């Protein structure tokens, strides 16, 4: 058994298999996942686990060089946007319409579904390198 970091075997395996510039997505309970995209469903109840709990856990093991967020988060969920920026202070942020973010899930290694119940709590993480 792992002592630290991600103990969910599916999430741990996805992160371990990431290469430079690969994408991993984390999102709220309502985000539709395209057919063919691996879905890792961690949601057990409303807000369990929260989006930020899962994001912070993934960030313990994943080097991120860029993130993609829905443009709508700026107006519809500014508190979550601030939480994300605090968790990833030196990472480039790209915004796109929510409809484009949903389409982009087809390019991710997996989508991790949380129990989050706030709008636009979805992110695509672009993997960096550690050297």
Swiss-Prot record:
Gene Ontology BP annotations: D-ribose catabolic process
Assigned keywords, A-Z: Carbohydrate metabolism, Cytoplasm, Isomerase
Major site of localization recorded for this protein: cytoplasm
Subcellular localization: Cytoplasm
Class of this enzyme: isomerase
One function term, GO molecular function aspect: D-ribose pyranase activity
Active-site positions on this chain: 20
Reactions performed catalytically: beta-D-ribopyranose = beta-D-ribofuranose
Source species, domain of life: Bacteria
A GO CC term attached to the entry: cytosol
Membership in a protein family: Belongs to the RbsD / FucU family. RbsD subfamily.
Function: Catalyzes the interconversion of beta-pyran and beta-furan forms of D-ribose.
Database matches in HAMAP family: D_rib_pyranase (MF_01661)
Protein name, as recorded: D-ribose pyranase
Species assigned in the record: Limosilactobacillus reuteri (strain DSM 20016)
């Amino acid at each position: 058994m792992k002592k630290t970091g991600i103990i969910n075997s599916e999430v741990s395996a996805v992160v371990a298999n990431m290469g430079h510039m690969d994408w991993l997505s984390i999102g709220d309970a309502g985000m539709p996942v395209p057919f063919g995209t691996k879905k890792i469903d961690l949601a057990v109840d409303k807000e369990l686990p929260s989006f930020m709990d899962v994001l912070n856990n993934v960030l313990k093991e994943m080097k991120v060089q860029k993130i993609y967020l829905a443009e709508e988060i700026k107006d519809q969920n500014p508190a979550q946007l601030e939480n994300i920026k605090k968790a990833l202070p030196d990472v480039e942020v790209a915004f796109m319409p929510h409809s484009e973010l949903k389409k982009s899930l087809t390019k991710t290694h997996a989508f991790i579904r949380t129990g989050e119940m706030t709008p636009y709590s979805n992110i695509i993480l672009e993997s960096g390198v550690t050297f």
